[in-house]
Amino acid sequence: MSTLKKPNLSDPKLRAKLSKGMGHNYYGEPAWPNDLLYIFPVVILGTIACVVGLAVLDPAFLGDKANPFATPLEILPEWYLYPVFQILRVVPNKLLGIALQTLIPLGLILIPFIENVNKFSNPFRRPVAMAFFLFGTALTIYLGIGACLPIDKSLTLGLF
């Protein structure tokens, strides 16, 4: 069964619509040029209008205004470097901190050799890779949250 609707070209109403350039969405005309040239720009401009409207109506501020005469107590890196910053901050020896960070790519490189499974198999049936992924995700979130706290509360996240 075809998913396209076949046009009845003997219908005079359809012929009148087609002569005016109407009716192309009813019988399965390809997306080019009608949808790509007319519908997509309308959706793109509508999305841009929504984003600009929301930005004008409710601007999001990045934080406190910069004051060059007041240095914060602890200078934090960008948010995506929080876990790395936490490792370097907590480990007493900086060389050990760098060595711990080199273990991350080495561990990722070793996963295919540890778990020899067909690459087309279901990823949820790969227990070693799933365990690495879940442990790494939990550790990254834990280290990222800990980096935002003072050093004495960073390992316990202030819970204990």
UniProtKB/Swiss-Prot annotation:
Which GO molecular function annotation, any one, does this entry have?
Answer: electron transporter, transferring electrons within cytochrome b6/f complex of photosystem II activity
Q: Which Gene3D superfamilies match?
A: plastocyanin oxidoreductase (1.10.287.980), Single helix bin (1.20.5.510)
Q: What InterPro entries does its record include?
A: Cyt_b/b6_C, Cyt_b/b6_C_sf, Cyt_b6/f_cplx_suIV, Cytochrome_b_C_euk/bac
Q: Does the keyword Transmembrane helix apply?
A: yes
- Assembly behavior: The 4 large subunits of the cytochrome b6-f complex are cytochrome b6, subunit IV (17 kDa polypeptide, PetD), cytochrome f and the Rieske protein, while the 4 small subunits are PetG, PetL, PetM and PetN. The complex functions as a dimer.
Q: How does it sit in the membrane?
A: Multi-pass membrane protein
* GO CC annotations, alphabetized: plasma membrane-derived thylakoid membrane
Q: Does the keyword Lyase apply?
A: no
This protein's name: Cytochrome b6-f complex subunit 4
Annotated transmembrane regions: 36-56, 95-115, 131-151
Q: Which HAMAP family match?
A: Cytb6_f_subIV (MF_01344)
> Which GO terms are recorded in the biological process aspect for this UniProt protein?
photosynthetic electron transport chain
Indicate where this protein is primarily found. membrane
Species this protein is from: Prochlorococcus marinus (strain SARG / CCMP1375 / SS120)
Q: Where in the cell is it found?
A: Cellular thylakoid membrane
Report the protein's function: Component of the cytochrome b6-f complex, which mediates electron transfer between photosystem II (PSII) and photosystem I (PSI), cyclic electron flow around PSI, and state transitions.
Instruction: Give the protein family.
Output: Belongs to the cytochrome b family. PetD subfamily.
